[in-house]
From Swiss-Prot:
The gene is groES. Heptamer of 7 subunits arranged in a ring. Interacts with the chaperonin GroEL. It comes from Marinobacter nauticus (strain ATCC 700491 / DSM 11845 / VT8) (Marinobacter aquaeolei). InterPro entries: Chaperonin_GroES, Chaperonin_GroES_sf, Chaprnonin_Cpn10_CS, GroES-like_sf. Belongs to the GroES chaperonin family. GO terms for biological process: chaperone cofactor-dependent protein refolding. This is Co-chaperonin GroES.
Length: 95
């Protein structure tokens, strides 16, 4: 099943969580922080402006983005957890 976001929404696959700290300490599941980076896997058509025109999104499929730890809403598609967020929740694109 595929998911197609509407308007200025973006679907992001969160990066894998770190299992160890930089010092080599293994973290239990509940001590891990949610990663705030991910890969864009789908984008909507764009934001609808007040004059009725549609402005394309600045991010595209395949971009690695940075977002707030609590940004977006989590959904499960085919057993995989994905985030759906507004483009405004994205801080930047890693290059």
């Amino acid at each position: 099943m595929k998911i197609r976001p509407l308007h200025d929404r973006v679907v992001v696959r969160r990066k894998e969580e770190e299992e160890k700290t930089a010092g080599g300490i293994v973290l239990p599941g509940n001590a891990k922080e949610k990663p705030s980076q991910g890969e864009v896997i789908a984008v909507g058509n764009g934001r609808i402006l007040d004059n009725g025109e549609t402005r394309a999104l600045a991010v595209k499929v395949g971009d690695t983005v940075v977002f707030g730890q609590y940004a977006g809403n989590t959904v499960k598609v085919d057993g995989e957890e994905l985030l759906i967020m507004s483009e405004n929740d994205i801080y930047g694109v890693l290059e």
